[in-house]
């Protein structure tokens, strides 16, 4: 199976240690990669592609969101593909960056009455799918992406994040 070269950076926030985040992220994304290869026939390069995960706070992600998306507010996760990829096409050697905000993640998890780690898992899967060109702007795209998220999370032993909950509007690219 294709492994990922995951680079972790904890910038701000009350996150677990980098070692804990590395272990959790590796487990989550290995399952996600295996799913995409088996179920979506997603090709991967022979050499492990690099992925940057940045764990930060609401203030930092708000600034990034304002600069890159013209939305001056914090969000839970942002994804920045290194190269444009559409689902099913070969990604480059660098997948891109996923940035997660601690306070927003913590607040949303509490609102949904879900464990912090479970919501973090969902956000990492969500952000990772964005790096492969999946999106949720149009209803049909959102339905496809949410279906993939639900199936991947099921492989990780987690319930459907959209089942009984209203869709979180802040899940953004």
Swiss-Prot record:
The keyword Cytoplasm applies. Coiled coil: none annotated. One of its GO terms (cellular component) is cytoplasm. Its main location: cytoplasm. Zn(2+) binds at residues 126, 130, 136. It is found in: Cytoplasm. It comes from the Bacteria. Gene3D superfamilies: Metalloproteases ('zincins'), catalytic domain. Its cofactor is Zn(2+). InterPro entries: MetalPrtase_cat_dom_sf_prd, YbeY, YbeY_CS. Its EC number is 3.1.-.-. Binds 1 zinc ion. Keywords: Cytoplasm, Endonuclease, Hydrolase, Metal-binding, Nuclease, Ribosome biogenesis, rRNA processing, Zinc. GO terms for biological process: rRNA processing. One of its GO terms (molecular function) is metalloendopeptidase activity. Belongs to the endoribonuclease YbeY family. Single strand-specific metallo-endoribonuclease involved in late-stage 70S ribosome quality control and in maturation of the 3' terminus of the 16S rRNA. This is Endoribonuclease YbeY.
């Amino acid at each position: 199976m294709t492994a990922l070269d995951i680079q972790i950076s904890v910038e701000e926030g009350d996150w677990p240690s980098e070692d804990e985040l590395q272990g959790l992220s590796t487990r989550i994304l290995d399952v996600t990669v295996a799913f995409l290869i088996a179920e979506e026939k997603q090709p991967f390069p022979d050499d492990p592609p690099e992925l940057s995960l940045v764990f930060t706070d609401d203030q930092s992600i708000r600034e990034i969101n304002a600069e890159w998306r013209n939305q001056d507010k914090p969000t839970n996760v942002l994804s920045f593909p290194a190269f444009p990829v559409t689902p099913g096409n070969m990604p480059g050697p660098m997948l891109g960056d996923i940035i997660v905000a601690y306070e927003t993640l913590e607040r949303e998890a509490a609102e949904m009455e879900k464990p912090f780690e479970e919501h973090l898992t969902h956000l990492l899967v969500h952000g990772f799918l964005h790096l492969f060109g999946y999106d949720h702007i149009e209803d049909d795209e959102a339905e496809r992406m949410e279906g993939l998220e639900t199936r991947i999370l099921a492989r990780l032993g987690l319930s459907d994040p959209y089942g009984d909950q209203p869709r979180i509007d802040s899940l953004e690219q």
